[in-house]
Amino acid sequence: MKILVMIKQVPDTATQVKIGGDGRAIDTAGITWIVSPYDEFAVEEALRIKEKRGQGEVVAVSLGPERTKEALRSCLAMGADRAVHLKDPAWDAGDTLMTARALAAVIKQEAPGLALFGRQAIDDDMGAVAAQVAELLGWPCASWIMEEAVDEAGKTVRVGRQVEGGLEIFDLPLPAVASAQKGLNEPRYPTLKGIMGAKKKEIKEVKASDIGGATEPAALSVVKLESLPPRPPGRVIQGEAAEAAKELVRALREDAKAI
């Protein structure tokens, strides 16, 4: 069984992100990049499916600039067999739908039994690509899954989707799309052997012309990015407890409009 895992390279959560000079994108200078954490759950689950079945192939796929290969190498170090890197200036100003079209085209070429995503990328929190890919392919889709089990015949996958108070259980015919939620598993750390072996594994570079081109322009564009305003300093209320309590209530009601 072949499993494709779509991943995205995002800024490390510990990185101080600044807005670029054009006001429409972040300044990438000095940023540390990582695999989006939710995508790591998807990679881990793909590896577990392969290990449980005793055979198969796990392919990591990502769209982005040259540095995206670092994220793909991380997936190869975890245990993915090979990777596909979608890299073309035609996708530089793309939105989620353009990304979904490109990924769907690769998925059609690869013809996997299962396509896994993280529930959302932590840089934009859009969470749209998995569902868009499923719609473009005409495949069933389950989002935010907390458990999964592929049947022995490789014909269906049973997934548990988190809802308030429990799990919704679905049986999806394969091929299908699913997006991973935190709690699905605990992603493994790459071993030294895995890190060294990743250097020898294939990363296939794909251009827009290889999959039919980026024929439709992005439907969504960023107008402006703004930094959050500085947080106002706290206020210490002095005095006797009774008077301080009255002042606190007044401040919450009249100044903060909190009560």
How would you label these PLM feature ranges?
Residues 1-259:
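N-terminal glycine-rich FAD/FM-binding segment characteristic of electron-transfer flavoproteins
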